[in-house]
């Protein structure tokens, strides 16, 4: 039992971070304090503030502390530790994806493209957008309004005539001389920039002025083009929310909570434009106060490695925050400018907050219905297999094209649904092309021949295939030499029916040595189909990426001494990949940056291919 009195005698009154561990040496809670001794002492009073705290204290085996120079530093360290340890009594943000931006590059003929990652390329970044779909929609809209190129430089540099985008009026063809002047092209780039900045009226004023000027010059064809562009821009503006206020860059957050599930709705507004919204479903311990949830979410959302998320000037929330000033100070330091957190707003900001609240409740209701359906299906599967509970299920599938670029997938489910952070793909190598049995053996060996923690051992392993696939899987498990209990998982084959139609699947249960034909309306079958389809889609998407990579690689990447710059030079000076392959040794050696020795290596490699 943890001796709190003895522990507290050595705790400092300095600011810092504390980590609480259970008897398995797992971090179960991370917290921070202005005064460590005062804060930690509060956990061991007779009357604790909540049932959550009571459960936490009952699980403590030992506590570690880390001193910091300030409370702000402690706040940052706390969020880093939460991300590292994922403690079960902390609120956990389960979404750690970076966010996409729109990038306006800095080059002679600037291009507009989507970008995700650190801002390492020169140019202007607009965003972040809530998801890739919002970026694609905006890029498609920009193409219709402003004929600015969106193609890759490798395409742009090797054009001898305009592409289809020019033919349909979505690019002005700066890649080919004589179609558009630099001045005209830069005018359209500037209009696109103003539009992305939310300066719609400036765009309209400019276009109206150009239309009137063209009319005065009797250039009615050009005036008509400006008229059409004005109508297109106005049509877009009319569909957008019109605000009488000048809205700053801001994120608006609202939380809905019901039946142990929380939804945080985040609305992104940049330069006066609503870029979209996104729902988050953080893992919330029972009996967590919603103000604590909001506070923790804000910190994790912006501070955990940034994840490509830009910190706006203003963050609007619908809960009072106890540590508002500390969060503002830390976010301001991270952003390099003043960042404010607003808990009470009026006007259009209030309307946006109400909209976020409505969306949060709607998204939560959808999630609750999905969770309810998942729970019913999960229980039906438990009943079917005569199992008291199923903690973890894994499913495997193989994908290839004529035996090439073979990829195996593993998807993971628990009673709440997919555990996408645990999904894995495996490259299959060293087998006869198209041998799915050998591929299944290899992926199972890769997955299970290593040590597994207790909570990572699956209760059920679904094999997408019939008796042949299942027997290979059983053979792999029979020969596994591992410390964990390899007899625990139930191996189940999911064979397609006679007509290979959904709903006619046959379950082959290895431990019970029986086959089950389930009716179309079986909830257990619906769950198995969901898991199987998820595995199938995961395998196919991985295979397509691998196939596309093999298709687009030029062969130059594998040659020692040929990096990205030399590859670009070869393609540029010799007219693309076919030009490089047809080039003589002397022609390759004439490319800037290519030595005679390297030219010989390139020539021999491509000749042998």
Curated annotation (Swiss-Prot):
The source's domain of life comes to Bacteria
UVR domain location: 201-236
Q: Which GO terms describe its biological process?
A: DNA damage response; nucleotide-excision repair; SOS response
Question: Mainly localized where?
Answer: cytoplasm
Q: Where is the GIY-YIG domain?
A: 13-91
Q: What are the coiled-coil residue ranges?
A: none
Location(s), subcellular: Cytoplasm
What InterPro entries has UniProt attached to this entry? Answer: GIY-YIG_endonuc, GIY-YIG_endonuc_sf, GIY-YIG_UvrC_Cho, Hlx-hairpin-Hlx_DNA-bd_motif, RuvA_2-like, UVR_dom, UVR_dom_sf, UvrABC_protein_C
> What keywords are annotated for this sequence in UniProt?
Cytoplasm, DNA damage, DNA excision, DNA repair, Excision nuclease, SOS response
Output the CDD domains linked to this UniProt entry.
Answer: GIY-YIG_UvrC_Cho
Q: Any idea which GO molecular function terms this record carries?
A: DNA binding; excinuclease ABC activity
Identify the GO cellular component terms for this protein. Answer: cytoplasm; excinuclease repair complex
Is Cell division one of the keywords UniProt gives this record?
no
Sorted alphabetically, which SUPFAM superfamilies does this protein's record hold? C-terminal UvrC-binding domain of UvrB, GIY-YIG endonuclease, RuvA domain 2-like
Family membership noted in the UniProt record = Belongs to the UvrC family.
HAMAP family of this UniProt entry? UvrC (MF_00203)
Q: What does this protein do?
A: The UvrABC repair system catalyzes the recognition and processing of DNA lesions. UvrC both incises the 5' and 3' sides of the lesion. The N-terminal half is responsible for the 3' incision and the C-terminal half is responsible for the 5' incision.
According to the record's subunit comment, the protein's assembly and interactions are: Interacts with UvrB in an incision complex.
Entry protein name: UvrABC system protein C
Which species is this record about? Haemophilus influenzae (strain ATCC 51907 / DSM 11121 / KW20 / Rd)
């Amino acid at each position: 039992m943890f001796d709190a009195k003895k522990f507290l005698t050595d705790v400092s009154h300095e600011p810092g971070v504390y980590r609480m561990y259970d008897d398995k040496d797992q971090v179960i809670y991370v917290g921070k304090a202005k005064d460590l001794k005062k804060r930690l002492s509060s956990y061991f009073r007779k009357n604790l503030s909540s049932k959550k705290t009571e459960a936490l204290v009952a699980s403590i085996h030992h506590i570690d502390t880390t001193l910091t120079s300030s409370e702000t530093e402690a706040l940052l360290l706390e969020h880093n530790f939460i991300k590292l340890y994922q403690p079960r009594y902390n609120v956990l943000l389960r979404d750690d994806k970076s966010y996409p931006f729109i990038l306006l590059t800095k080059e002679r003929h600037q291009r507009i493209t989507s970008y995700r990652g650190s801002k390492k390329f020169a140019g202007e970044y607009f965003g972040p957008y809530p998801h890739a779909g919002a970026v694609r929609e905006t890029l498609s809209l920009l193409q219709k309004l402003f004929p600015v190129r969106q193609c890759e430089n490798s395409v742009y540099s090797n054009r001898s005539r305009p592409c289809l985008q020019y033919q349909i009026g979505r690019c002005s063809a700066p890649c080919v001389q004589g179609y558009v002047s630099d001045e005209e092209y830069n005018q359209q780039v500037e209009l696109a920039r103003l539009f992305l900045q939310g300066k719609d009226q400036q765009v309209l004023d400019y276009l109206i002025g150009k239309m009137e000027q063209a009319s005065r010059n009797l250039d009615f064809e050009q005036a008509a083009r400006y008229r059409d562009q004005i109508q297109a821009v106005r049509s877009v503006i009319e569909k957008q929310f019109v605000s009488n206020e000048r809205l700053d860059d801001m994120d608006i957050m609202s939380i809905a909570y019901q039946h142990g599930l929380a939804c945080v709705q985040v609305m992104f507004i940049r330069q006066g434009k609503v870029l979209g919204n996104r729902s988050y479903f953080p893992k919330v311990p029972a009996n967590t106060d919603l103000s604590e949830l909001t506070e923790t979410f804000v910190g994790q959302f912006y501070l955990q490695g940034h994840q490509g998320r830009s910190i706006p000037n203003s963050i609007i929330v619908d809960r009072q925050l106890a540590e508002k000033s500390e969060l503002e100070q830390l976010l301001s330091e991270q952003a390099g400018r003043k960042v404010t957190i607003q808990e009470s707003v009026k006007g259009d900001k209030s309307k946006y907050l109400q909209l976020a609240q409505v969306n949060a409740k709607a998204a939560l209701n959808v999630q609750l219905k999905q969770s309810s359906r998942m729970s019913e299906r999960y229980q039906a599967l438990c009943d079917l297999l005569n199992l008291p509970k199923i903690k973890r299920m894994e499913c495997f599938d193989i994908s290839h094209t004529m035996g090439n670029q073979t990829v195996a997938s593993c998807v993971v489910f628990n009673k709440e649904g997919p555990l996408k952070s645990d999904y894995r793909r495996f490259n299959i190598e060293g087998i006869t092309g198209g041998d799915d049995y050998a591929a299944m053996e290899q992926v199972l060996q890769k997955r299970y021949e290593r040590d597994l923690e207790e909570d990572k051992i699956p209760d059920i392993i679904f094999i997408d295939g019939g008796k042949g696939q299942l027997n290979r899987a059983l053979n792999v498990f029979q020969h596994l030499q591992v410390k964990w209990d390899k007899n625990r998982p139930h191996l189940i084959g999911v064979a397609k029916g006679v007509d290979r139609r959904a709903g006619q699947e046959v379950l082959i249960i290895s431990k019970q040595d029986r086959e089950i034909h389930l009716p179309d309306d079986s909830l257990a079958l619906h769950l198995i189909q969901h898991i199987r389809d998820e595995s199938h889609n995961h395998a196919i998407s991985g295979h397509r990426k691998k196939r596309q990579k093999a298709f687009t690689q030029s062969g130059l990447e594998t040659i020692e001494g040929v990096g990205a710059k030399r590859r670009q030079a070869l393609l540029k000076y010799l007219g693309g990949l076919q030009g490089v392959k047809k080039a003589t040794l002397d022609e390759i050696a004439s490319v800037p940056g290519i030595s005679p020795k390297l030219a010989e290596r390139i020539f021999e490699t491509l000749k042998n291919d």
